[in-house]
Amino acid sequence: LTEKNGIRIDVADPKNLGPIVGNTEALAAIAALLDAGKADLNGSTVSFPLSSGFSGFTDAAGLTKFNRALAARVAVYRKDWPAALTAVNESFYSLDGDFSTGVYDVFATGTGDQLNSAFFPQNQAGEVRLAHPSYATDIETGDDRISKASLRTSPTSSSGLSSDRDVWVYTSSTAPVPIIRNEELILIYAEANIQLGGAGLTAAVEALDKIRTSHNLLPYAGSVSSAALTTELLKQRRFSLFFEGHRWLDLRRYDLLSDVHVRD
């Protein structure tokens, strides 16, 4: 989240760990690890059990698509736009597919299972998860993603934030949490095309329109420029991927982590 703390890459010897490396080297190592995983999966047979969160992705072909989806995300973080597009097209990305298709962390109530700690009942007092009021004021009229920030029966406060809306993304204690899903891949496809420019801008508009119209909005009618489409992209990522762990990373990537933007 800070992009400054770094990670250790060399951990082969737990008694003699390698140095902490910076963001650029860390992302390069992650990308290389994903590439190695893809190579290992090629022609392999998967013999180990996977949770229900991997439904549809349990064989080598499915895991390769999952691997490429993660590689696309990493490529975006690295600003390697051609690599992002290549990885997206090798993933389970589908412009006309179900937005929820993907791989998930799953939860259950059985012995030894874990509950989703991001679930908080609506209208609860005390320990709450509140949506910033700007989520409701910034969203366009008719956008069905307003349901992710449900209106409370009465406002409350937590950690200095007062709001009349609860975060309502995970609606039960066993609701799955996406690791990566098709809607994010569509947005990655749009972002890479925006950054590549040229004919990519038209492809980006098509992808953004798919997001908009699927959430009850009219097609994009703004300027078809890299700057304007980046603003639109970040808006759609904000509402589509709300409470999935992307917003601050997105703002940091575009140098927008100011007090004005951090609120949401």
Question: Model-found features: residue ranges?
Answer:
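Non-catalytic, surface-exposed connector residues within folded enzymatic/regulatory domains
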Residues: 202-205, 223, 245
